[in-house]
Design a protein with these regions (language model features):
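Helix-turn-helix DNA-binding segment
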Residues: 144-182
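Short hydrophobic/Thr-rich beta-strand motif most characteristic of the beta2 strand and flanking loop
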Residues: 26-34, 41, 196
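Acidic catalytic/metal-coordinating carboxylates
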Residues: 34-37, 60-63
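Short, flexible helix-to-coil linker/hinge segments that flank and couple to helix-turn-helix
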Residues: 88-94, 104-154, 158, 208-212
Protein backbone atom coordinates (compact mmCIF):
# COMPACT_ATOMS: atom_id res chain seq x y z
CA UNK A 1 0.00 0.00 0.00
CA UNK A 2 1.36 3.41 -0.98
CA UNK A 3 0.69 6.13 1.58
CA UNK A 4 0.32 9.59 0.07
CA UNK A 5 0.07 13.03 1.67
CA UNK A 6 -1.41 15.84 -0.43
CA UNK A 7 -0.50 19.30 0.86
CA UNK A 8 -2.36 22.29 -0.56
CA UNK A 9 -4.26 25.12 1.10
CA UNK A 10 -6.74 25.25 -1.80
CA UNK A 11 -9.57 22.90 -0.85
CA UNK A 12 -10.58 22.26 -4.45
CA UNK A 13 -7.11 21.07 -5.44
CA UNK A 14 -6.45 19.13 -2.25
CA UNK A 15 -9.75 17.26 -2.13
CA UNK A 16 -9.70 16.67 -5.88
CA UNK A 17 -6.31 15.00 -5.73
CA UNK A 18 -7.35 13.02 -2.66
CA UNK A 19 -10.48 11.67 -4.35
CA UNK A 20 -8.59 10.65 -7.48
CA UNK A 21 -5.88 8.86 -5.52
CA UNK A 22 -8.25 7.24 -3.01
CA UNK A 23 -10.13 5.64 -5.90
CA UNK A 24 -6.97 3.93 -7.15
CA UNK A 25 -6.01 0.45 -5.98
CA UNK A 26 -3.15 0.25 -3.52
CA UNK A 27 -3.11 3.91 -2.50
CA UNK A 28 -4.06 5.47 0.83
CA UNK A 29 -4.22 9.25 0.97
CA UNK A 30 -4.51 12.00 3.56
CA UNK A 31 -4.44 15.77 3.20
CA UNK A 32 -2.86 18.75 4.91
CA UNK A 33 -3.70 22.44 4.49
CA UNK A 34 -0.48 24.04 5.72
CA UNK A 35 3.25 23.54 5.95
CA UNK A 36 3.11 23.02 9.70
CA UNK A 37 0.40 20.38 9.36
CA UNK A 38 2.37 18.72 6.57
CA UNK A 39 5.48 18.35 8.72
CA UNK A 40 3.45 17.03 11.63
CA UNK A 41 1.71 14.49 9.38
CA UNK A 42 4.99 13.32 7.87
CA UNK A 43 6.47 12.77 11.33
CA UNK A 44 3.38 10.98 12.67
CA UNK A 45 2.12 8.98 9.68
CA UNK A 46 5.29 8.40 7.64
CA UNK A 47 3.82 8.66 4.13
CA UNK A 48 5.74 7.21 1.20
CA UNK A 49 4.99 10.09 -1.16
CA UNK A 50 4.21 13.76 -0.50
CA UNK A 51 2.61 16.00 -3.12
CA UNK A 52 3.49 19.47 -1.86
CA UNK A 53 2.22 22.83 -3.06
CA UNK A 54 5.10 25.17 -3.83
CA UNK A 55 3.35 28.22 -2.38
CA UNK A 56 1.30 28.17 0.84
CA UNK A 57 0.16 30.96 3.15
CA UNK A 58 1.95 29.97 6.35
CA UNK A 59 5.28 28.46 5.31
CA UNK A 60 6.84 28.49 1.86
CA UNK A 61 6.58 25.07 0.23
CA UNK A 62 10.29 25.13 -0.56
CA UNK A 63 11.04 25.58 3.13
CA UNK A 64 8.78 22.65 3.98
CA UNK A 65 10.54 20.58 1.32
CA UNK A 66 13.89 21.28 2.96
CA UNK A 67 12.52 20.41 6.40
CA UNK A 68 11.09 17.13 5.11
CA UNK A 69 14.31 16.21 3.32
CA UNK A 70 16.24 16.65 6.57
CA UNK A 71 14.08 14.13 8.43
CA UNK A 72 15.39 10.59 8.99
CA UNK A 73 14.24 8.36 6.11
CA UNK A 74 12.25 11.14 4.40
CA UNK A 75 9.43 10.41 1.96
CA UNK A 76 9.64 11.17 -1.74
CA UNK A 77 8.40 14.69 -2.43
CA UNK A 78 6.98 16.03 -5.69
CA UNK A 79 5.93 19.65 -5.97
CA UNK A 80 2.52 20.84 -7.14
CA UNK A 81 2.73 23.94 -9.28
CA UNK A 82 1.05 26.09 -11.91
CA UNK A 83 2.45 27.79 -14.97
CA UNK A 84 2.96 31.04 -13.06
CA UNK A 85 5.17 29.24 -10.55
CA UNK A 86 7.92 28.43 -13.07
CA UNK A 87 10.49 30.49 -11.19
CA UNK A 88 10.27 28.15 -8.19
CA UNK A 89 10.94 24.92 -10.08
CA UNK A 90 14.73 25.22 -10.20
CA UNK A 91 15.00 25.73 -6.45
CA UNK A 92 12.62 22.85 -5.75
CA UNK A 93 14.60 20.42 -7.87
CA UNK A 94 17.92 21.50 -6.40
CA UNK A 95 16.41 21.06 -2.93
CA UNK A 96 15.66 17.40 -3.54
CA UNK A 97 12.20 17.28 -5.09
CA UNK A 98 11.64 14.13 -7.14
CA UNK A 99 9.79 16.11 -9.79
CA UNK A 100 6.76 18.28 -10.14
CA UNK A 101 3.17 18.05 -11.31
CA UNK A 102 0.98 20.78 -12.64
CA UNK A 103 -2.28 21.24 -10.77
CA UNK A 104 -4.23 20.58 -13.96
CA UNK A 105 -2.61 17.17 -14.43
CA UNK A 106 -4.85 14.66 -16.22
CA UNK A 107 -6.64 12.72 -13.44
CA UNK A 108 -5.82 9.43 -15.15
CA UNK A 109 -2.11 10.25 -15.01
CA UNK A 110 -2.04 10.98 -11.28
CA UNK A 111 -2.08 7.42 -9.80
CA UNK A 112 0.65 6.17 -12.18
CA UNK A 113 2.74 9.22 -11.29
CA UNK A 114 2.43 8.44 -7.59
CA UNK A 115 3.28 4.79 -8.21
CA UNK A 116 6.39 5.82 -10.14
CA UNK A 117 7.46 8.13 -7.32
CA UNK A 118 6.97 5.36 -4.76
CA UNK A 119 9.24 3.08 -6.83
CA UNK A 120 11.98 5.71 -6.86
CA UNK A 121 11.21 7.15 -10.29
CA UNK A 122 10.89 10.77 -11.29
CA UNK A 123 7.84 12.72 -12.38
CA UNK A 124 7.98 15.62 -14.80
CA UNK A 125 4.62 16.87 -16.01
CA UNK A 126 4.25 16.50 -19.78
CA UNK A 127 3.19 20.14 -19.82
CA UNK A 128 6.55 21.34 -18.51
CA UNK A 129 7.36 24.50 -20.42
CA UNK A 130 10.52 24.94 -22.44
CA UNK A 131 11.23 28.00 -20.33
CA UNK A 132 11.40 25.87 -17.19
CA UNK A 133 13.77 23.35 -18.75
CA UNK A 134 16.07 25.94 -20.30
CA UNK A 135 16.00 28.20 -17.27
CA UNK A 136 16.85 25.36 -14.92
CA UNK A 137 19.72 24.07 -17.00
CA UNK A 138 21.15 27.52 -17.66
CA UNK A 139 22.43 27.48 -14.08
CA UNK A 140 24.41 24.31 -14.83
CA UNK A 141 27.49 23.74 -16.98
CA UNK A 142 27.71 26.40 -19.69
CA UNK A 143 28.06 24.07 -22.66
CA UNK A 144 25.80 22.67 -25.33
CA UNK A 145 23.98 19.46 -24.36
CA UNK A 146 25.48 17.68 -27.37
CA UNK A 147 28.98 18.31 -26.04
CA UNK A 148 28.14 16.98 -22.59
CA UNK A 149 26.45 13.93 -24.10
CA UNK A 150 29.69 13.00 -25.84
CA UNK A 151 31.06 12.04 -22.45
CA UNK A 152 28.41 9.32 -22.05
CA UNK A 153 28.77 5.79 -23.36
CA UNK A 154 26.02 4.34 -25.52
CA UNK A 155 24.69 2.33 -22.59
CA UNK A 156 24.69 5.39 -20.35
CA UNK A 157 22.67 7.30 -22.96
CA UNK A 158 20.11 4.47 -22.95
CA UNK A 159 19.88 4.66 -19.16
CA UNK A 160 19.55 8.46 -19.31
CA UNK A 161 16.55 8.18 -21.65
CA UNK A 162 14.85 5.76 -19.25
CA UNK A 163 15.57 8.07 -16.31
CA UNK A 164 13.93 10.87 -18.28
CA UNK A 165 10.90 8.63 -18.85
CA UNK A 166 10.55 8.39 -15.06
CA UNK A 167 11.72 4.81 -14.55
CA UNK A 168 13.27 3.74 -11.25
CA UNK A 169 16.54 1.80 -11.07
CA UNK A 170 14.61 -1.45 -10.69
CA UNK A 171 12.44 -0.64 -13.71
CA UNK A 172 15.51 0.23 -15.79
CA UNK A 173 17.22 -2.98 -14.73
CA UNK A 174 14.22 -5.03 -15.84
CA UNK A 175 13.91 -3.16 -19.15
CA UNK A 176 17.61 -3.48 -20.02
CA UNK A 177 18.14 -6.95 -18.50
CA UNK A 178 20.80 -5.66 -16.11
CA UNK A 179 21.32 -5.99 -12.38
CA UNK A 180 20.12 -3.14 -10.19
CA UNK A 181 23.69 -2.64 -9.03
CA UNK A 182 24.88 -2.15 -12.59
CA UNK A 183 22.12 0.38 -13.21
CA UNK A 184 23.12 2.28 -10.06
CA UNK A 185 26.69 2.42 -11.36
CA UNK A 186 25.48 3.78 -14.70
CA UNK A 187 23.30 6.40 -12.99
CA UNK A 188 26.20 7.52 -10.80
CA UNK A 189 28.44 7.86 -13.86
CA UNK A 190 25.76 9.83 -15.72
CA UNK A 191 25.29 12.32 -12.88
CA UNK A 192 29.05 12.81 -12.61
CA UNK A 193 29.62 13.26 -16.35
CA UNK A 194 26.70 15.64 -16.80
CA UNK A 195 27.63 17.53 -13.62
CA UNK A 196 24.11 17.35 -12.22
CA UNK A 197 23.13 16.47 -8.67
CA UNK A 198 20.16 14.16 -9.13
CA UNK A 199 17.89 12.10 -11.35
CA UNK A 200 15.42 14.89 -12.04
CA UNK A 201 18.19 17.21 -13.16
CA UNK A 202 19.46 14.47 -15.47
CA UNK A 203 15.95 13.99 -16.83
CA UNK A 204 15.66 17.70 -17.59
CA UNK A 205 19.03 17.58 -19.32
CA UNK A 206 17.77 14.73 -21.50
CA UNK A 207 14.67 16.75 -22.38
CA UNK A 208 16.72 19.75 -23.43
CA UNK A 209 19.07 17.55 -25.47
CA UNK A 210 16.10 16.08 -27.35
CA UNK A 211 16.75 12.50 -26.28
CA UNK A 212 13.08 11.82 -25.59
CA UNK A 213 12.27 12.41 -29.25
CA UNK A 214 15.31 10.98 -30.93
CA UNK A 215 15.91 8.03 -28.60
CA UNK A 216 19.23 7.02 -27.17
CA UNK A 217 20.90 6.07 -30.41
Amino acid sequence: MIRVLVVDDEALIRTGFQRILAAADGIEVVGAVSGAEALRTVREQHPDVVLLDIRMPDVDGLTVLGDIRRLPDPPVVAMLTTFDMDEYVETALRSGAAGFLLKDTDPEALPPAVQSLARGGTVLSPKVTRTVVDGYLSAGPQERPSKALQRLTGREREVLVLIAEGLSNADIAARMHLSTGTVKDHVSAILTKLEVSGRVQAALFAQRAGLLTEGAG
